């Protein structure tokens, strides 16, 4: 049976600058529970401890968000996203105290070693720990397997590949998921973003390659161009004969019901979303990049290229300002030197 992890109340928070209310969390968690969703993930878009001036502040704290969801769930498990460095061990302790069932410990795809103490902390409490490798497009299959094996060694009961930038095509997904499935003794999962319009297709390919966990959001509600759309995914999974706890009819009832209390808009794929996917940048960076390009008067798409050269990962918003400022200075020098590009002068 395929496990569906619903990130609407976590990744969806990115789409509204992390402003979900307690009432919305309670209503959606209850509806998702009734729809037979396996795991309902809740929190700031960047996970436990993510609320900040840099990343965006939530109107309510982690405790109230999790307590609200916990009270609404009966059969669905409560999950959280945790990035070491943004969150602390105390944040996991709080989540476990409240009754979180699944802790997804997420690291950059080449930094799994920082997940050890948090996976161990979760397992010691008798709860489920998943490892998550973010920005998975930035590492080849063998490197991802080596990192996933570390998480497995630390006690992770599954490893999820996160296509955080919406960069991947089906062939890339197949190669990476197959490598992990063949090399691990634990389940493999996949989390897609829709920057190139491939989220559902990539999720189906991941399942064909042996993944047993897929992430999705109602109406695709999520960062950038959105996540895998839950209703579309479940319909396609039924067509392909995948067994789940839910059905298309149940998730359609869930989606329609959200119009009264959540009203998530299915994201449209904008040129900026395509650019962030093409250049492999975290989907949540789009509004920050657009703002910086406007403030410094530089070309938005040139800024995407520059940031891609820096190989940005989540949590490096300050570098967006740095590169926009550098582009502006280069433009000013170019004008002063009669059109000679700064990079030509330094070559």
From Swiss-Prot:
Single biological process term from Gene Ontology: catabolic process
Domain Pyruvate carboxyltransferase residue range list: 2-252
Feature type site, description Transition state stabilizer: 10
One Pfam family from the record: DmpG_comm
Residue ranges of the TM segments: none
MF terms (GO), sorted A to Z: 2-isopropylmalate synthase activity; 4-hydroxy-2-oxovalerate aldolase activity; manganese ion binding
Top EC group: lyase
EC number in record: 4.1.3.39
Binding site for substrate: 10-11, 164, 191
Substrates-to-products reaction catalysed: (S)-4-hydroxy-2-oxopentanoate = acetaldehyde + pyruvate
Residue positions of the active site: 14 (proton acceptor)
InterPro entries membership: 2-IPM_HCS-like, 4OH_2_O-val_aldolase, Aldolase_TIM, DmpG_comm, DRE_TIM_HOA, PYR_CT
Disulfide bonds: none
Tagged with keyword Manganese: yes
UniProt entry keywords in alphabetical sequence: Aromatic hydrocarbons catabolism, Lyase, Manganese, Metal-binding
Top-level taxon: Bacteria
Binding, Mn(2+): 11, 191, 193
Family that this chain belongs to: Belongs to the 4-hydroxy-2-oxovalerate aldolase family.
PANTHER family, per the entry: 2-ISOPROPYLMALATE SYNTHASE 1, CHLOROPLASTIC-RELATED, HOMOCITRATE SYNTHASE-RELATED
Protein name: 4-hydroxy-2-oxovalerate aldolase
């Amino acid at each position: 049976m395929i496990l569906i992890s619903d990130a609407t109340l976590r990744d969806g928070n990115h789409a509204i600058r992390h402003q979900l209310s307690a009432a919305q969390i309670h209503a959606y968690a209850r509806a998702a529970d009734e729809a037979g969703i396996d795991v309902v993930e809740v929190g700031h878009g960047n996970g436990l401890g993510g609320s900040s001036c840099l990343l965006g502040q939530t109107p309510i704290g982690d405790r109230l968000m999790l307590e609200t969801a916990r009270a609404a769930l009966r059969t669905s498990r409560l999950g959280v996203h945790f990035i070491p460095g943004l969150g602390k061990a105390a944040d996991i302790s709080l989540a476990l105290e409240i009754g979180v069932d699944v802790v997804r410990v997420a690291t950059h795809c080449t930094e799994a070693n920082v997940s050890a103490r948090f996976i161990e902390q979760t397992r010691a409490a008798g709860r489920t720990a998943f490892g998550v490798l973010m920005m998975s497009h930035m590492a080849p299959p063998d490197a991802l397997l080596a990192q996933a094996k570390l998480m497995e060694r630390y006690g992770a009961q599954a490893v999820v590949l996160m296509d955080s930038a919406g960069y991947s095509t089906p062939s890339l997904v197949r190669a990476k998921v197959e490598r992990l499935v063949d090399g691990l003794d634990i389940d493999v999962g996949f989390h897609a973003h829709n920057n190139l319009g491939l989220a559902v297709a990539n999720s189906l390919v991941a399942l064909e390659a042996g993944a047993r966990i897929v992430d999705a959001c109602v109406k695709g509600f999520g960062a950038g161009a959105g996540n895998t759309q839950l209703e579309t995914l479940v319909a396609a999974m039924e067509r392909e004969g995948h067994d789940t706890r839910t059905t298309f009819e149940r998730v359609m009832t869930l989606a329609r019901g959200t119009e009264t209390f959540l009203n998530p808009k299915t994201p449209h794929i904008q040129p900026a979303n395509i650019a962030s996917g093409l250049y492999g940048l975290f989907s949540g960076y789009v509004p920050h990049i657009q703002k910086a390009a406007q403030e410094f008067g530089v070309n938005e798409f040139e800024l995407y290229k520059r940031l891609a050269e820096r190989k940005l990962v989540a949590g490096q918003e300050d570098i967006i300002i740095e590169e926009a400022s550098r582009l502006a200075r280069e433009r000013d020098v170019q004008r002063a030197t009669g059109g000679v590009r700064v990079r030509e002068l330094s070559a």
